[in-house]
Structure formats: C-alpha cells, structure tokens
Amino acid sequence: MARSHPLERYRNFGIMAHIDAGKTTTTERILYYTGKSYKIGEVHDGAATMDWMEQEQERGITITSAATTCLWKADEGKGPEHRLNIIDTPGHVDFTIEVERSLRVLDGAVAAFDGVAGVEPQSETVWRQADKYKVPRMCFINKLDRTGANFYYCVQTIIDRLGATPAVLYLPIGAESDFKGLVDLVNERAIIWKDESLGAEFFYEDIPADLADKAAEYREKLVELAVEQDDEAMEAYLEGNVPDVATLKKLIRKGTLNQAFVPVLCGSAFKNKGVQPLLDAVVDYLPSPLDIPDVQGINPTTEQPDSRATSDSAPLSMLAFKIMNDPFVGSLTFARIYSGTLTKGSYLNSVKDKKEKIGRMLLMHANSREDIEEAFAGDIVALAGLKETTTGDTLCASNAPIILERMEFPEPVIELSVEPKTKADQEKMGIALSRLAAEDPSFRVSTDHESGQTIIKGMGELHLDILVDRMKREFKVEANVGAPQVAYRESLAKPVDVDYTHKKQSGGSGQFGRVKVSVAPGERGSGITFIDEIKGGNIPREYIPSVEKGMREAAENGHMIGFPIIDFEIRLTDGAYHDVDSSALAFEIAGRAAMREVAAKAGIKLLEPVMKVEVVTPEEFMGDVIGDLNSRRGQIQGTDSRGNAQVVEAMVPLANMFGYVNQLRSFTQGRAQYTMQFSHYEEVPNNVAEEVKAKMA
C-alpha cells in the first residue's frame, strides 16, 4: 500500500481553545463537512463524536485528545485532496498537560475564541504554551450568533491580551441572530450560507454596500501585512501594484509559517457557518510536515544532538504522545511518525532499549477505526499492544537510534487517599491506577509507608475527580476517597555540617561507613544537588553513589511530618572506609542517617504550594471576590478590566482553595469563573504550620 497523499498535502493540526469557545462543536462540523460523520453530534446533548469518554459527555468538556483523520479538497472541491489529522486538545486548566502533549506533535493550530468574550484566561495559557513549541497558528472567532457577540472587540483582544498581530481574512455579515455569512477579503466577495442544508451549501454574491468601506479598509491592512513578507512584492506594492489572489495567498502562508502574524477567521460552528472557509484556510495557510524544521533529538550512543528529516526514506522515528484504554482494542498508543515508514509486524527500539513489536496499527476516527498495514512520515497512528512505551517516549529503527526531546511534566500539587471498599476491589484498583498513571504522566500513585494507604496525586481537584470516576466506570472499582490533601514540602532552615559513622559488628564481617557532609538550603526550585568533594580516595568511588542514594531517600521521607525535603545542596567533603566491613549498603545506611541528623540539626521549615489564581467576574461582585481571596490568605497581584468584566489576579495557598468553585458560584450567582495553576512553594506562617503539624500528627 503506497502513500495516498504526498507530504505537502498533509496538515497535522489541533484546535485549541478556552472551555466554552466551541472547540468540540467546530471539530464535529469539520468531520461532518469532510464527510466522515454523517449525523452532527451536539455537545449540548452529549453526543459529539470527538468526546468519546462517558465523563466528557456528561461534563461537556473535552478531556482526552483523540486524533482523527479526514480528507478535504479546498476551493469547493476543485483543489487537490489534502489529508487532515486533527488532534483534539482539552481546554480546562487541570488538563494543561494534555495540551502540552498535543502541541508537541502538531505542526499548526487553530485557536478558537468565543465571539462574546474574545481571548479568555485559559486561551492565554494555551497560547503561551503554543509559543513555547513555536507552533504557527490562526484564530477562529466562533459563536458569532450569540447575543453580545462582537467580532471587532475579539480581534482587539488578540492584540491586547496575546500581543499577536491579527491578519483579518473574513468579516462577518450581520451579527447575533442576524449573522448570515462572511465577507471574504482575499477573494473580495460575500459568502452566504443556506440554513436548510445544515450549512453544507452556500452561495457567493457581491459584498453588501454597507460593508464595502469596511471591507476595503480591512483588505488594505491585510495586503500591507502580506507584502511585508517579500521584498519584491513590497516594491511592487509601493509602485501601486496590488498582488493578485494567488500571490496574496502565498504571502499570507509565508507570514503565518514565520509567525509574523495570525490569520483571523470567523463564523458560528453551531449554526454551521464559516466551517468550510476555515478548512480552506487550514489547507492554504497552516504548515505541512515539510514546512517545519527537522525534528531534533539526541543520539543515545554518542549523546550528541541529532535530527531526522521528514521523509519516508529516512530512518524511522516517532513519538508516543498519548496512551488510552480503548474498550475494544485494549491499550492504544497514539504516535506521530516524524520520519521513515512503519510496517505492521516490524520491531522497533524504544527509549528504554527494549524491542517493541508493532501488532495492530489503526487510523482513528473519533470513535471508529480503520486497520492499516503501513504508515508514513507525517502520519498519526494508534498502535495496539505496545508493552514498554509510555507517554513521551521515542520509538525508532533499531539500527538508527534517536531520542526525540522528552516532554516536561509538572509536579502534582494535590493528593487524595483512596481505599478499596472490598478485598476484591483491592487487586482491581492496583491495575486500574497503574493503567491510568501510564496514560497520564501528571498523575502519580504512591503508598504511604506509615498508614499503608494508597495516595494519588494530580494537577487539581477536577483532574483527580475524573480519574477516580474513570476508575469506577472503566475498571469497576469501588473506592472510598479521602479529603484532598495539600502536597506540602519541607526545607532546611540553615546550613549545617554533619560527621556520621555507621558501624555494626555482629560476628563475621560487619558494616562500616563514615561520611562528612556540608548541607545548605538552596534557592526555591533548585532541587537537590549532590557535589562530591572527596580527595585522595577516603571513600572509594564505587560507594559515593550509595551515599547520595541514602541521603536522597531520607530527604524524600521528610523529617517534620513526612513530606519530602527539597531544594538543598549536599557537599560530601570527607569520610572513611574499612577494607573488609565497608560495602555499598553500609554507605547507603550512613547517608540515610546523616541526612536525618542534618534535618534534626538544621531545623525544618514547612513549605506549601502557592497557586496563581485568576478570577474573571462582573464588576458588581469585585469587592466580594477580593474580600474572599484575602480571607484565604491570598495576596492580590493586580486587577484589570476585560471587556465588561473585571479580572483579579492573586497568589493563594492551595490549602485555602479547596471547594473554591462552589463558593465563588454562590456569591457571584454563577457568573464568575476562575483558573488556577501552580506557581511556587513558599514558607508557611508559624501559626498555620502548627495547625498542619497537629492535623498530621
């Protein structure tokens, strides 16, 4: 089976957006018009094809990025057929990890905004993440049929809040309930949709007279932005020659790929208007896999930087970006192929230096699947039955190993204890949690040594809620869930020196190890550094890693109330060993005991996670919101107005944010919303530290 579409006709893109900007609806419509799902699924009634997990259907938010393949011919079907791989990204802040992960494998993105609100807090977060991965993107201002929708205000928010340069390609005709079509500035015509054909049919007419001046003004702005991309076009334009449509499209494409500006489109996916122009723009302006730089990695044998060209003949390299449990196929690993050709039955090398056999290979459509024998560079495939691969791993040809950059995953800030209700649930719970942790690297599972409880940790209350819920539904595990706990940390109060000797004599060979360490608290976020300053072999080389291991393990178990001690520097300055009695174990025990002595001598300060909280509220509740945040030990960082709403930014300890969503809804009548993400660890005030100690004791 040969390649069906040349690489330049591939578009791997995602739709990124704030919770309610209509991302799933837009994806649904794309699938409908590209002919893959024949009945339009509405999120309002929980049937969208992309949202295939039960919880998503209930909550109406997208949780997992399903990858879907569809085909599209631009220019009303006259253009060459393109293959679109759409990666659905979640828009809720507890799932930013999923967003990071999908951005890593996209070539381009469409940012969808709500036509009333414009750029919202979460849109900014996702936009910054896309900046980090240098993803070329365009904007789709959606929901223009809503009361209060204002296209021009939204364009202004792209400038004010994202600092981006918008290149407007379409203007809306009519607003709110009278919204009926678009002015196409590139082709200088109006597009009107027919409601009775579910928006599948539309016709062209002249630009309405009342919009003629506005259209001329916006087209001129667009042309000026475009000609800046090319010296010849610029000179011609200054001499009074306006580029023709084909040239204009080329220049817009160039500017989009260079991220000089972002094309702006508009419509209402729910009312089936503006989706076809959006698809045409994806084809015309977003990058193909050939337009993005070669994927970078490291050669594991030489540890030198290496790269792979996007071509079927290059050695195979691919990145696993998502693992999901599919009720019919079992575990599915979604992977993006950057280079080479993948055939069913072949063996690949995983980062862990294990061999993986490719069994079933599937192309996913929201929830139907097609078996394939072969896949090529640029494809996004789902692989069944991989044993060793986790999210973020590279799979590559065994004769040409490469490790594509690892993704970075944030540390979890909130934890819960879960206990199985019955003995039968115990075993199932273990399996369920390990599967869920394999799917989602921002979710951790551990056992509390003292109480024997299972602790799960994640990025926020919603994140853990959904995971516990999935455990019940997918794995049929009934569990009692404890109250959420804050992931506190401990830190050393002052620098200390410790000289510790571990000695044990019990007939035969004993144990002996002596270590001298200087330990000092470091900057917040610096982690634990271990510096070996042993001179003259006082501790043999092979025992030094054991000292470090012992000290790190003791730090992990904490001292005051059992939370890990973080951010300090250990200098191993001296020590002693015995020819017969010394061993790796003896030095590990010495390291562990030395660390405990360090903690006792230096004294411990308790640290708590502080969250960056942003509340968007109508003006009249502003006083209540600020008062409430202050009562939660919050520090107000600033306020700002956004359209007709006010934004309050504050730093608030996580311990005081539990249940905030319900409280906020009650005193703002459900009209305010907030986002919260981890900012940093900070020392806990003494009175609070005493309370925490008493509670944990």
Swiss-Prot record:
Domain tr-type G: from-to ranges: 8-290
Stored Pfam families: EF-G_D2, EFG_C, EFG_III, EFG_IV, GTP_EFTU
Q: Which positions are annotated as binding GTP?
A: 17-24, 88-92, 142-145
Instruction: State the PROSITE patterns in the record.
Output: G_TR_1 (PS00301), G_TR_2 (PS51722)
Out of the domains of life, which is the source? Bacteria
Q: Where in the cell is it found?
A: Cytoplasm
- GO-annotated molecular function: GTP binding; GTPase activity; translation elongation factor activity
Q: Which GO terms describe its cellular component?
A: cytoplasm
Q: Name one GO biological process term.
A: ribosome disassembly
> Which InterPro entries did the record assign?
EF-G-like_DII, EFG_II, EFG_III, EFG_III/V, EFG_IV, EFG_V, EFG_V-like, G_TR_CS
HAMAP family membership:
EF_G_EF_2_B (MF_00054_B)
Q: Which family does it belong to?
A: Belongs to the TRAFAC class translation factor GTPase superfamily. Classic translation factor GTPase family. EF-G/EF-2 subfamily.
The protein's role, per its UniProt record: Catalyzes the GTP-dependent ribosomal translocation step during translation elongation. During this step, the ribosome changes from the pre-translocational (PRE) to the post-translocational (POST) state as the newly formed A-site-bound peptidyl-tRNA and P-site-bound deacylated tRNA move to the P and E sites, respectively. Catalyzes the coordinated movement of the two tRNA molecules, the mRNA and conformational changes in the ribosome.
Q: What is this protein called?
A: Elongation factor G
